[in-house]
Every structure is written in structure tokens, then in C-alpha cells.
From Swiss-Prot:
Subunit note: Component of the CFIA complex, which is composed of RNA14, RNA15, PCF11 and CLP1. Interacts with RNA14, RNA15 and RTT103. Interacts directly with the phosphorylated CTD domain of RPB1/RNA polymerase II.
Protein name as it appears in the record: Protein PCF11
GO BP terms in the entry: mRNA 3'-end processing; termination of RNA polymerase II transcription; termination of RNA polymerase II transcription, exosome-dependent; termination of RNA polymerase II transcription, poly(A)-coupled
Keyword Transcription: yes
Organism (species): Saccharomyces cerevisiae (strain ATCC 204508 / S288c) (Baker's yeast)
Taxonomy, superkingdom: Eukaryota
Region Interaction with RBP1 CTD (CID), annotated ranges: 1-130
Length: 626
């Protein structure tokens, strides 16, 4: 292969690789190249066959379209070369593509069978015969597989298919109201539906009807897909037209502004000078206009024009102020000059010595951090933070400006404690101890959020008369006092509730020493009737101890509420800070039943003191076993 042939083949291959969609311009270009360079026919054939073998299944059909166009428009020797391997290419492609592409391949093959101008088929007869036999076997096999995959036809199933086809046809008829074929199709479908309802057809007849309905349904789907593609192409064309119109408008605006500038320069050139010859002034104006408007390469947007106007105003104002001596110019070795040099300011050029020094200097962000740390360190110099009168909490210091806070202590606050809690805003330092405190603080937030959000179903219970109305929510109930008393607030320390080091944590149920073991052991069996009576009926038990008993709400409880069998009052769950659990306060559990501990205590006392003690105990047993 010589150099010219190699260049042509490379061009052909590069164009062929762009054929990833059904593009008529690309196929036409390939056909023209094949027609103009018949000496390279074998290379072109090899390239197309390689493209069909290696490209994606979705793109194989487009390469076949290029093959078809070249053979129909150019003819020999391409038809001879392609006939050698046509059957294998067609067979492999047919087995890989989907049913829609297979239908298009079959339609293309039917066109190959039609005789051309010489009265012969497009390709050799042996290759076309092999393809025809293959398609017969493949269609028969496909028909069998399709029939095997289809469900057993029944009248209700076919009626549903007819309804689907009717809907599709009606949608098409809305867009094409004058189409007589669609109207006839709707009429045939309605008649077929009536016949299926009237007569009892055999299974074979039902299968034939099913296959015909499937074919019609696939055709309608194909038509709808093509219509959707057509609409998408129209939308793309509209977008392109809009973009072109916008570009044209911008170009028109540009030409209008250019014409205005040109007319202005012409008028200024044609003006009669008051003194002397105007040749020098015209030359200066021409050079000025050419320098200002001669190198415009594109159209500027309105925002850019406004930005330039504002920058010009600022520059003019700065120049006028500097000319009046109202702007302080820092000396050459000042920190401002050094800062601008390090940042690469355009007004400050660096010599070789300064560039070498700049390499040894740290980065600007690090220098800013060092400067801020120095400000924070010297912020409290000569300031007694605890005894300063300007820092005392009073109305005067709050309403008036406080220079010590604004100029000194703010630097100390944000530099000495740079790490801020994203939830509450509390600040922490960079030391290891401060980081540990921050982690404990975040753990405390996690525990609080877990309590607030919760994962159990809770209930807001409302009682009207004797009816119990419950509404299930996903947010736990918060039972706590909003404000502390003065003495509690003075003695309050954040670390006691935010730290995880303290043993007296909320999740430790054994921290409460005032509650006896019978209150903590909520799941203990109290089957022994005598032990319950001795515990609750003891003379040494007082009312506070009885009311202090509680039961952890079981996981099986959905509404977190129960009704006391004795007083018929509804008890709802509250969150216990000390145990970290949802509990029913003033409650005991007896044989799987829950009672108010005070109600149970009073009932047991009354039954023991009564003359008919056995009857009272029997009544209590009934309450327990209900």
C-alpha cells in the first residue's frame, strides 16, 4: 500500500467510525469515497466487514446500510467482494440484534432479491440462497419459541389485548383524525371483541387471534417509537434554530455598535478645525479608533459591558483621588507592598533577588494564620478579663459600643477556639484535651438527638369520657423542665452532662440509689400472693416509696399506654433521665398485669383489714386475672 492509498483508507476508516447512528450524510460520503477510489475497493470492504464484526449490536445495522448504499450505487467490484462473506456477516448480526433490528434486516434482504438494471440480483445467488434458508429456519424457530412463551389464550386475556390495541389506535387517531385505516382498524377490533363474547372458539383459533394481535401491537409500538424520535429531532432542530437566531441577533447588535462608532469617527474627522490643519488630529483619531475598535474579535455580553463600565468608574475615581493626594501610598518595603508582591500584583514587578527571597518565604495563608495567632495572643495583654468594668454584664455595656470586645477579645475568641460545634455553636481549641472535650460534646448531642427522634412508636393519649383515643407518632415525648432555678443554674456545669467519663450517666440504670431493688427489677415474678401482700401491705412502706416504683415500657407496647384495672385511669410513658428508659411511673407488674402501685397498695390494705378478707382477696385475684 502506497502513501496516497494509506491516507485514503485512513480517511475512510475515520468516517466509518463516526457512523454510530443512522446518518445519511455520513453514508453518502462513504459511498462517494468508494466510487472515486475503486482501486482501494478491497481495503474499503475489509474496513466495513471489520466494523460490522467489532461494533456494538445497536450500530451494526448502520454499517449494513453503508454496505447496501455502496453496492447499489457503485456496483462491481464491491458486490463481488461483499458476496464472499455476506452470509456469515448477516447471520452473526441477525443473532445478536433485537427484534426491531431483525425486522429491518429482513426488509433490506427483500430489497436485495429484487433484480437490478442487468436483471440479476444485487449479490451472488448462492449467498442470497443461504440467507433465505437461514431466515426461514430462524423465523419458524422464533414463531415456535414465541408461541411457547405466550400464555394459554383465553377469552378474557384476548379481550384485554383488544382493549390495549383500541387505546393505542385511539391515541393515534387523535393525532391523525382523517386516517381512514385507523378508523377501519377500530371498527374491526370492536367487531372482533363482540365475536369473542358471543361464540366459543377452539384453542387453535384463539392462538391465531393471539398471534395476530401481537403482530398488530408490535407494529403500533414501532410507529409510536418512530413518532417519538421524529418529535425529538424536531425539538433539537428548534433548539438549533433558536441558538442560530440568538447568534444572529448578537451579530446584528455588534454591527450596529460598530456602525455607530464608525459614523462617530467620520463625523469627527469631517469637522472643520478652528485652528490650523486638522491632519494631525485626524491621524490621531484614526489611530485611536483603530486601536479601540479594530481588534474586536467577538461580541461582548451586556453583563461584561456593565462590568467594564463600573471598573472604569472605579479606576477614574482612584486616579482622581490619588492625583489630589488623598490616597496614602505605602513605602517600598512596607508589609502592604510585600503582600501585593507575594500575591503577584500586576503593579509590582519582582527582580531576581526578590524572586529568590519569595521562594524561601512561606505561603500567604500561613502568614495570615501566624498574624491572626499573634493578634489573639496579644489580645488580652494589659486587660484583666475578670475585673474589667467594661466587660461587666450591664445595660450600658450591652447597648453601647465596646471597643475592647470588638478590637481585642473577638480575635482571642475565634483564634484560641477555632473549632465550632455545628449544632449549638460552642467553640473548642486545637489541643488534645480540647479535641477530647469536643468529641464528648458531640456524643452528648447524639444522645440528645436519639432521645428526641427516637425509634419506638409513642402515643399522645387523650381521654374523653370513657373512650381512649390514641394517635401514633414517631417522635418521643420530652418531659422536662425548661428552666432551672437560680441556685441550680449557679451550680450547673456543662461538663457534668456532656462528658462521657462520669459514671453517673443516663444509660446507667443502677445510679439511682433511692429506688429499692423491687423497683429496678421490673420483670421479677410476683406469683407468690403472700409476698406481694407483705411487700405492699407493710406498715413501714410510705407513700413516697410506693409512688417511686416504676416499670420500663415493654417493647411490645405500641401506644406506650395502659389502663389501670382498679381506677380505670390511663397511664402514659414518660422518659426517665436517670435510667435512660421510657417508663410507667407509679406502676407495678403482677402476673403480666400492670397496676398503679398506690391503687394496688390501697386495695390490698383494704382487703386485709376488712372483715371479709377472703372476699377482698378473691376480688383482687379477679382483677389480676382479667
Amino acid at each position: 500500500m502506497d502513501h496516497d492509498t494509506e491516507v485514503i483508507v485512513k480517511d475512510f476508516n475515520s468516517i466509518l467510525e463516526e457512523l454510530t447512528f443512522n446518518s445519511r450524510p455520513i453514508i453518502t460520503t462513504l459511498t462517494k469515497l468508494a466510487e472515486e477510489n475503486i482501486s482501494c475497493a478491497q481495503y474499503f470492504v475489509d474496513a466495513i466487514e471489520s466494523r460490522i464484526e467489532k461494533c456494538m449490536p445497536k450500530q451494526k445495522l448502520y454499517a449494513f446500510y453503508a454496505l447496501d448504499s455502496i453496492c447499489k450505487n457503485v456496483g462491481s467490484p464491491y458486490t463481488i467482494y461483499f458476496s464472499r462473506n455476506l452470509f456469515n456477516l448477516y447471520k452473526r448480526t441477525y443473532l445478536l440484534v433485537d427484534n426491531t433490528t431483525r425486522t429491518k434486516l429482513i426488509n433490506m434482504f427483500k430489497l436485495w432479491l429484487n433484480p437490478n438494471d442487468t436483471g440479476l440480483p444485487l449479490f451472488e445467488g448462492s449467498a442470497l440462497e443461504k440467507i433465505e434458508q437461514f431466515l426461514i429456519k430462524a423465523s419458524a424457530l422464533h414463531q415456535k419459541n414465541l408461541q411457547a412463551m405466550l400464555p394459554t389464550p383465553t377469552v378474557p386475556l384476548l379481550l384485554r389485548d383488544i382493549d390495549k390495541l383500541t387505546c393505542l389506535t385511539s391515541e393515534r387517531l387523535k393525532n391523525q383524525p382523517n386516517d381512514e385505516k385507523l378508523k377501519m382498524k377500530l371498527l374491526v377490533l370492536s367487531q372482533l371483541k363482540q365475536e369473542l363474547k358471543r361464540e366459543k372458539l377452539t384453542l387453535n383459533a384463539l392462538k391465531q387471534v393471539q398471534m395476530q394481535l401481537r403482530q398488530v401491537f408490535s407494529q403500533d409500538q414501532q410507529v409510536l417509537q418512530e413518532r417519538m424520535r421524529y418529535h425529538e429531532l424536531q425539538q433539537q432542530q428548534q433548539q438549533q434554530q433558536q441558538q442560530q437566531q440568538q447568534q444572529q441577533q448578537q451579530q446584528q447588535q455588534y454591527h450596529e455598535t460598530k456602525d455607530m462608532v464608525g459614523s462617530y469617527t467620520q463625523n469627527s474627522n469631517s469637522a472643520i478645525p478652528l485652528f490650523g490643519n486638522n491632519s494631525d488630529t485626524t491621524n490621531q483619531q484614526n489611530s485611536l479608533s483603530s486601536s479601540l475598535f479594530g481588534n474586536i474579535s467577538g461580541v461582548e455580553s451586556f453583563q461584561e459591558i456593565e462590568k467594564k463600565k463600573s471598573l472604569n468608574k472605579i479606576n477614574n475615581l482612584y486616579a482622581s483621588l490619588k492625583a489630589e493626594g488623598l490616597i496614602y501610598t505605602p513605602p517600598k518595603e512596607s508589609i502592604v507592598t510585600l503582600y501585593k508582591k507575594l500575591n503577584g500584583h500586576s503593579n509590582y514587578s519582582l527582580d531576581s533577588h526578590e524572586k529568590q527571597l519569595m521562594k524561601n518565604l512561606p505561603k500567604i495563608p500561613l502568614l495570615n494564620d501566624i498574624l491572626s495567632d499573634c493578634k489573639a495572643y496579644f489580645a488580652t495583654v494589659n486587660i484583666d478579663v475578670l475585673n474589667n468594668p467594661s466587660l461587666q454584664l450591664s445595660e450600658q455595656t450591652l447597648l453601647q459600643e465596646n471597643p475592647i470586645v470588638q478590637n481585642n477579645l473577638i480575635h482571642l475568641l475565634y483564634r484560641s477556639k477555632p473549632n465550632k460545634c455545628s449544632v449549638c455553636g460552642k467553640r473548642f481549641g486545637n489541643s488534645e484535651s480540647e479535641k477530647l472535650l469536643q468529641n464528648e460534646h458531640l456524643d452528648w448531642h447524639f444522645r440528645i438527638n436519639t432521645r428526641i427522634k427516637g425509634s419506638q412508636n409513642t402515643a399522645n393519649t387523650g381521654i374523653s369520657n370513657s373512650n381512649l383515643n390514641t394517635t401514633t407518632t414517631r417522635k418521643n415525648i420530652q418531659s422536662r423542665n425548661w428552666y432551672l432555678s437560680d441556685s441550680q443554674w449557679a451550680a450547673f456545669k456543662d461538663d457534668e452532662i456532656t462528658s462521657t467519663k462520669h459514671k453517673n450517666d443516663y444509660t446507667d440504670p443502677h445510679a439511682n440509689k433511692n429506688i429499692d431493688k423491687s423497683a429496678l427489677n421490673i420483670h421479677a415474678d410476683e406469683n407468690d400472693e403472700g409476698s406481694v401482700d407483705n411487700t405492699l401491705g407493710s406498715d413501714r412502706s410510705n407513700e413516697l416509696e410506693i409512688r417511686g416504683k416504676y416499670v420500663v415500657v415493654p417493647e411490645t407496647s405500641q401506644d406506650m399506654a395502659f389502663k389501670c384495672p382498679i381506677c380505670k385511669e390511663t397511664v402514659t410513658g414518660v422518659y426517665d433521665e436517670e435510667s435512660g428508659e421510657w417508663v410507667w411511673k407509679n406502676t407495678i407488674e403482677v402476673n403480666g398485669k400492670y397496676f398503679h402501685s398506690t391503687c394496688y397498695h390501697e386495695t390490698s390494705q383494704n382487703s386485709s383489714k376488712s372483715n371479709s378478707g377472703k372476699v377482698g382477696l378473691d376480688d383482687l385475684k379477679k382483677l389480676v386475672t382479667k
